[in-house]
């Protein structure tokens, strides 16, 4: 099972406040473990503009038509002082990894310097921190019915309203997530 470029959709029974009703985009999944970003839990009163201001990044070619009043997400409980930028493919950043034909993740400052300019990637999601799993841990959580899985959809990732992402991701599986009982079993 390789869940890279998949969504993990928290089952209603998952009560950990860090992951309750969350959707996680899996950026990497291999024999050593997995890493992903929560894409539906914005940090309150923290925007992309706030991040750029705190880091003293003032792009020279700033386009006022491009809004920086976009949420920054609590990507997960690990390394929550580090930024992770999911975006549509654009080459030329110092530390980028292509996740799928439609998505990349960048952790270098140079991507931040393009935000709000004509040089920024078409779609961008900024997160602080990440969710991580040790070898076999994610697979076990899936077997224990903590998560539903589905191949990621960039429309949900970048364009679906934040409050609708959990329900919409489950809807893509044909499931009304709110009607699922809190405890599931295996047939």
Curated annotation (Swiss-Prot):
GO terms for cellular component: cytosol. Gene3D superfamilies: VC0467-like (3.40.1740.10). InterPro entries: AlgH-like (IPR003774). Disulfide bonds: none annotated. Belongs to the UPF0301 (AlgH) family. NCBIfam families: PRK00228.1-1. This is UPF0301 protein Spro_4027. It comes from Serratia proteamaculans (strain 568).
């Amino acid at each position: 099972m390789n869940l890279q470029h998949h969504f993990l959709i928290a089952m209603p029974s998952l009560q950990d406040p860090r992951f309750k009703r969350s959707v996680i985009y899996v950026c990497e999944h291999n024999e050593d473990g997995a890493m992903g970003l929560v894409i539906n839990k914005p940090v309150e009163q923290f925007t992309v503009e706030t991040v750029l201001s705190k880091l003293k990044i003032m792009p020279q070619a700033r386009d006022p038509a491009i809004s920086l009043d976009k949420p920054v997400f609590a990507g997960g409980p690990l390394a929550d002082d580090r930024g992770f930028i999911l975006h549509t493919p654009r080459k030329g950043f110092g530390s980028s990894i292509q996740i799928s034909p439609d998505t990349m993740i960048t952790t270098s400052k140079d991507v931040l310097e393009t935000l709000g300019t004509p040089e920024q990637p078409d779609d961008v999601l900024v997160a602080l921190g990440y969710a991580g799993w040790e070898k076999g841990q994610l697979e076990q959580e899936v077997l224990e019915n903590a998560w539903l899985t589905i191949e990621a959809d960039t429309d949900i990732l970048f364009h679906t309203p934040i409050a609708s992402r959990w329900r919409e991701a489950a809807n893509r599986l044909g499931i009304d997530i709110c009607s699922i009982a809190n405890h599931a079993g295996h047939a």
